[in-house]
Amino acid sequence: MRLPMNTSLATLKPSGIRRINALAAQHPGCIALALGEPDFPTPDVISAEVTAALDRGDTHYPPNNGRPALREALSAYMGDAGLTFSADEVILTDGATEALSATFMAMLNPGDEVIIPTPAFGLYESIVVANHAKAVFLDTEPAQFQIDEDALRACVTPATKAIVICTPNNPTGCILNAASLDAVARVAEQAGIYVVCDDVYNRLVYVDGYERFAQRHPELREQTVVIESFSKPWSMTGWRLGWLAAAAPVIAEIAKAHQYLVSSAVSFEMDAAARALTVDPTPMLKVYRARRERVLAALDAMGLDVVEPAGAFYTFPSIKKFGLTSEDFCIKAIKEANVALVPGNCFGTEGHIRLSYCVSDKDLDEGLSRLSNFVSTCLLYTSPSPRDYAASRMPSSA
């Protein structure tokens, strides 16, 4: 006899990215341009702090929200970027994923709605649905991956509780411009909804003039939750460390969810986290910038249209002219060219693929060469595909 489980979780699909990587693993020598994980080791000065912490026996329960000294350091770090949150308004989390989970667990009631501009990290939808709420998708492709205010307003209903924005964006690498941020602010203020800012890529920006939502609109701090991560800027994906910041009344409720989800982040990583805040990620950024230029040049030579990424380490070229779904394109690329990419349907946007350039230079060049050869063999678009693209949506992970 099979006993019933959570019906909300039953509707969720496994990560599409992980599935693509599993398929790639079945093909020896496959070059994976799929997973968003830096190829650099964590800087030694950060790792050394863990060794020191273990040597002195720092293996006991820490405060739920993180040690006061670390939260002070996080507050100061955010202050340097123009975001004003006190140490008491900061929680150290078990990665940005847990920060998102705790935020939505604290925020959502059954039947609430969360606006998710697409393309977007599939985890947002999964967490929203797991909390018995509804994801409402805002297609940003017609606006070159910016926020059209009229389209955003059309998504708002009496049930709307929040909007999630990610800038720089995963999977496009695009940055929301001032007009987009202002549109979100106006709608959020007028509708009385939260703005959840997934800012995990904010240190990986290639252009001047980048602004974060909380920096540009401090007047909405009571409605804003900021989420950051140690994973991307300092190559600490396996550490599972992140943090979130929000106004005191909001953080008090999120702290309850955080406590019951994970109790706390890892005690012997906290000094390392504080040390990371002092490490300049610019050397890694310079490498990513050079790789980005090579990728854009290669995509141009292949005749693939792409909105130039201004941050993160992804591109999101269009493959519409080939008349294939993004899923079919990526499966064929693995089987026929031994190169792995992520289908756009993982992010809620068909007709595109995500290409990650946080891999070694050797693998990147070989992967681009294989992709170029594969593209040259694809038939040009001849007629619309009869397949239901919406039905092929898959959640993404990392």
In which residue ranges do the predicted regions lie?
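N-terminal small-domain helix-loop-helix segment of the aminotransferase-like
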Residues: M5-G95, A102, A276-V279, P283
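Helix C-cap/helix->beta junction micro-motif
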Residues: H27, N131, Q190-A191, M302, ...
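PLP-dependent aminotransferase class I/II
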Residues: P43, Q223-G311
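PLP-dependent aminotransferase-like
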Residues: D88, A106-I165, A178
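Active-site phosphate-binding strand-loop segment of PLP-dependent enzymes
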Residues: T140-A214
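Conserved PLP-binding active-site segment of the aspartate aminotransferase-like
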Residues: A246-A247, F316-G323, A337-L368, S372-F374
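Conserved PLP-binding catalytic core of the aspartate aminotransferase-like
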Residues: Y288-R289, M302-E336, I353, D361
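Conserved small/polar residues in nucleotide/adenosyl-binding loops
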Residues: Y381-P386
